[in-house]
């Protein structure tokens, strides 16, 4: 079986800087009924891809936060006396989720203006409070950049059935007063968590001890190892509800011994982009034999070995540039769309995305995705079916239905990469 791993620097040290995708992911867009979305996991289809999270701060009210990169918005001004500004329409709808039926219970639309009076900000955060009693809901949030004409819609699961589930916690980095909308944290950051519905409790922190392995190949008889609460070890806790995040997967909860809580994992700086040379060799494991990968990873000069791999695969440095750009662009897309309790490229969907690229079509239901490569009705088309798995660590976990028949397709695509050819649907 061939696997490969390689993480690219934004200004690629060997050849050419790849196009960075300054995006991140909180939950994947979902549909509540069978649908065939035009939306694929190709970042070039998105002008902006915000991250969104919901927080329950009291028994009868909640709040959502939206992060958007300023560089993804269009800032303009009517005349030279005005500040540059971006203008957004943000609307949301809340539906009850009972007995497999939906009922609209709340909807609002607001105008949001961000002014650049004090220079360019890296991110813009919008937040709004709304009334919400205990229960299970879905929430549709739509964002439109009025100056550019681009728009984005996302549906989230909103779970307020108890006080210790994931959306009862807000996560902050270092001394920031702005909450995080993603669960990927830079290694070495000080993490602080608040939970107003559990204000009288000291949070318990846990760390997952086993190594999170790469997913088995799509033709394997094995399934991915999903973290189990029994493999977490309890850390020392105090009233500060904070810790310094070392490498790994963490979990915080107000309910001792419960797997209801807030999970987060550490990443290198710049995530979901790939920037540092010590990251670059990991994703190429999908394309190499174990011996080849060990030769790269354990070498005193892994970059030179990695460069050699790409040049030998491509045949020339110019073709190697194309391979590198395509491969690491896909790594960044996987990190953007498929992050769960680990980096997106390490998930089932990330693995398929790196090797096969964006599918021709995606059929979605509330709890599944089917990726179709080729014409849907053709006998020659390839279908990958992913089932959503309920997990205390993430709301974005999809597991591939593996099949021995995928082996020839996988080996053909890996062989194409190793012979300097990239297929894009």
Where are the regions a protein language model picked out?
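Solvent-exposed, acidic/flexible segments
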Residues: 81, 85, 285-289, 299-303, ...
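Early exported N-terminus immediately downstream of N-terminal targeting peptides
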Residues: 273-324
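Low-complexity, Pro/Ser/Thr- and charge-rich linker/hinge segments at domain boundaries
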Residues: 160-184, 265-291
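Intrinsically disordered, low-complexity terminal regions enriched in Ser/Thr/Pro/Gly
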Residues: 27-228, 234-237
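Bacterial N-terminal signal peptides that target proteins for export
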Residues: 2-13
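A cross-family detector of function-defining hotspots
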Residues: 310-345, 350-395, 406-409, 413-425
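Edge beta-strands of extracellular beta-sandwich domains
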Residues: 150-159, 259-270
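C-terminal motif of bacterial Sec signal peptides marking the signal peptidase cleavage site
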Residues: 22-25
């Amino acid at each position: 079986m061939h696997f490969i791993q390689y993480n690219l620097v934004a200004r690629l040290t060997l050849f050419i800087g790849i196009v960075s995708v300054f995006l991140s992911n909180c939950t994947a867009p979902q549909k509540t009924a069978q649908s065939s979305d035009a939306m694929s996991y190709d970042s070039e289809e998105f002008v902006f891809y915000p991250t969104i999270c919901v927080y329950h701060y009291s028994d009868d009210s909640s709040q959502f936060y939206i992060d958007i990169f300023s560089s993804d918005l269009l800032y303009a001004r009517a005349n030279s006396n005005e500040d540059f500004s971006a203008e957004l329409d943000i609307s949301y709808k809340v539906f009850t989720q009972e007995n497999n039926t939906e009922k609209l219970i709340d909807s609002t639309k607001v105008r949001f203006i961000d002014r650049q009076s004090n220079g360019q900000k890296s991110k813009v955060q919008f937040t709004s409070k709304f009334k919400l009693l205990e229960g299970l809901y879905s929430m549709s949030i739509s964002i439109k950049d009025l100056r550019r004409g681009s728009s984005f819609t996302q549906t989230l699961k909103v779970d307020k059935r108890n006080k210790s589930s994931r959306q009862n916690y807000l996560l902050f980095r270092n001394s920031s007063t702005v909450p995080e909308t993603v669960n990927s944290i830079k290694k070495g950051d000080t993490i602080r968590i608040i939970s107003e519905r559990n204000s009288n409790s000291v949070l318990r922190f846990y760390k997952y001890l086993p190594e999170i392995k790469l997913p088995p190949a799509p033709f394997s008889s094995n399934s991915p190892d999903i973290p189990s609460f029994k493999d977490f070890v309890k850390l020392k806790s105090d009233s500060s509800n904070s810790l310094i995040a070392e490498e790994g997967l963490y979990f915080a909860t107000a309910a001792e011994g419960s797997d209801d809580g807030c999970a987060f994992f550490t990443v290198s700086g710049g995530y979901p982009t790939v920037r540092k040379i010590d990251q670059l060799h990991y994703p190429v494991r999908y394309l190499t034999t174990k011996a080849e990968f060990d030769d790269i990873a354990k070498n005193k000069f892994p970059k030179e070995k990695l460069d050699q791999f790409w040049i030998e695969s491509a045949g020339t440095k110019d073709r190697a540039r194309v391979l590198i750009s395509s491969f690491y662009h896909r790594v960044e897309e996987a990190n953007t769309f498929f992050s769960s309790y680990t980096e997106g490229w390490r998930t089932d969907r990330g693995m398929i995305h790196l090797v096969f690229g964006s599918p021709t079509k995606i059929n979605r239901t509330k709890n599944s995705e089917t990726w179709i490569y080729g014409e849907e009705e053709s006998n020659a088309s390839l279908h990958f079916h992913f089932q959503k798995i309920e997990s205390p660590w993430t709301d974005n976990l999809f597991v591939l239905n593996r099949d021995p028949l995928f082996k020839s397709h996988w080996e053909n695509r890996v062989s194409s990469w190793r012979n300097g050819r990239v297929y894009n649907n």
